[in-house]
Every structure is written in C-alpha cells, then in structure tokens.
Amino acid sequence: MGSIGSMNKPSEGMLMGLVQYPVPIVNSRRDIEASVDRICAATAATKAGYPGMDLIVWPEYSTQGLNTKKWVTEEFLMDVEEPLFQRYAQTCKENDVWGVFSIMERNPNKNQMPYNTAVIFNNKGELALKYRKLNPWVPIEPWMPGDLGQPVCDGPGGSKLSLCICHDGMFPEQAREAAYKGCNVYIRISGYSTQVNEQWILTNRSNAWHNLMYTAAVNLAGYDGVFYYFGEGQVCNFDGTTLVQGHRNPWEIVTAEVFPKMADQARTDWGLENNIFNVGTRGYVAHPGGVKDCPYTWVKDFAAGKYHLPWEDKIKIKDGSIYGYPTTGGRFGL
C-alpha cells in the first residue's frame, strides 16, 4: 500500500475499488434495469472521484438480485451479449476503467439450468474474461456448474486476473487452479449472508497465502427482508495478510493499491514457503529436482472420476429437495 487511503494510482501496479453494493430488491424486469442504471452511474462517479482507478468490482447478484421465486425465470435471466448487459461494457469504455460484473446467464442448452456468471470488461469495453461459477452454493442455488474452467486474462498494472464467485472461494483447489495458470490477482464476488462471514475472511487470506497471489473480494451489503449481507470488501497481500477491509456499510467503496510484480517476484525468488512450487517438487534438497509423483489419494481418485468419501453413504443432504427443488434434474422453474 503506497498512499493514504489508496486514493492514487501506483506507477507500477493498479488501483482497484470494491463496491459494497446494497442488496437489490428485484421483483420485475424493470427492477433489473434500474439496478443496471445505478451500477453504471456509480461506476462513472467512482472513476470521476478516483481518476486513477484501474478496476472496479461489483458483487455477485448485484445486477439481478436474489429473488429465489423468480431468479431462474426467463423474465430475470440475461445474456452477456444483450444490450442491457452491454451497458456495462459501454460504461467501462466511456470511463476508461476495467470492471467486474455479475449476471445470471441463460444456458444455451435450453434443457439445462442457467449459469451464475461473472465477466471482466476492459477499459475499451471489450470482453476480457468470462467465467461461470464452478461450485454453486448447494443445496440453495439451482445454477448449472460452470463449463468454462478457470480462465485467466491479462489485466492492468501487470496483473493476471481470474475470477471466482462466492462459494467458489471456499475451495482451495480452485484458487490453486487459478494460480497454476498464472493468476496473481484472484477476484471473488459474492452474495453471502452473515452466517459465513468469518469463513469468507479466512479463505480470502488462505487463498492468497497458499498461492502467493493477491486476493480481492467484495460482498453485497444490507438487508433484503430475509438475510443480512455483510459487505466487508477485503484485499489480501500475497503473504496472506489483510491490506484493507471494509465494514458492513452499503455503498462503501473499499480501495487498494496492489503490485502484481511483487507477487510474481515472490514466486520466483522465494525458497522457504514457495509452496505453490514446492508441492510439485517435494524434497528437492534430498532428491535433486524434487519428487514429482502425486502422493494424494483424493487427487488421483478425482481425476479418475472415483472421488468418494469414507462417510459419503451417510451424508443426508444430496439434492435440492430441502429448498423445494425437483430431484430429476433438467430445466425447471420457468
């Protein structure tokens, strides 16, 4: 962190802003349009207030809300290419800023459930990255697991960006996948309620430390009549320490300077605790070059399609019936 309150753009890094968007109460298509209006206006205002801002991040569900009675209906779903969502791209272009945005996306396969998707538009309004949530928050979320893997793209200030959505961040395997593909700034957008606030903070830090990369995470904020959403935008250094963390205030904008080249340097220069390298080169002092074989049963089983826990047959909740979802799969909720 190189400036008071992270108000200035660093010459060899990037200035980012995490917006603790008030959880939108969405009951109609017009409400979605109004949310897009607010996000576009706030993106422009934030860039005007922070002229050096490189990247602005909006939480999961900020576009379409969390109306579980309607969230999988055609009225509520969107496509990245449609004019309403493309307003975000135009806003990024007009304001010379990168942006991360949330969309509940129609599935091209009409026989399957929609995707929970996040995109990065660059400062020219171009689609830099599209990511579909790999690990929906079962059993409450009905989204189809993502089919795009864990993409990484070049970002501002020497960054290599990758996205995860909410529950994804609870999986260290996924953060490692992003880092293994070169990510040095791992962005997490979420719509969690307060029940997992501490675990969210913990995993943001651990994902950073395990992979020697920055993590930046932001959650919805406020009350929607059912749950309270905790906000608390957080940016973690590549050593797992928290650089900055917000409070529970809706509309709080958490800003941070990050220096991706420092994470890159740690990855190339460290010996002790360079664990993303050491895991694949075990014991290189005793065995030159390190032992390369995989010692982990679960990794081998997962790769072979045989992942099975010792207690798996005793697990009580394995479908969405507790939340009223059918157990037959396919497309439902139209």
From Swiss-Prot:
Class of the enzyme per the UniProt entry, highest EC level: hydrolase
Active site: 60 (proton acceptor), 133 (proton donor), 166 (nucleophile)
Catalysed transformations (reactions): formamide + H2O = formate + NH4(+)
Keywords (A to Z) from UniProt: Hydrolase
EC number of this enzyme: 3.5.1.49
Annotated GO biological process: putrescine biosynthetic process from arginine
Known role: Is an aliphatic amidase with a restricted substrate specificity, as it only hydrolyzes formamide.
Family: Belongs to the carbon-nitrogen hydrolase superfamily. Aliphatic amidase family.
Protein name according to UniProt: Formamidase
Organism (species): Nitratidesulfovibrio vulgaris (strain ATCC 29579 / DSM 644 / CCUG 34227 / NCIMB 8303 / VKM B-1760 / Hildenborough) (Desulfovibrio vulgaris)
Taxonomic classification: Bacteria, Pseudomonadati, Thermodesulfobacteriota, Desulfovibrionia, Desulfovibrionales
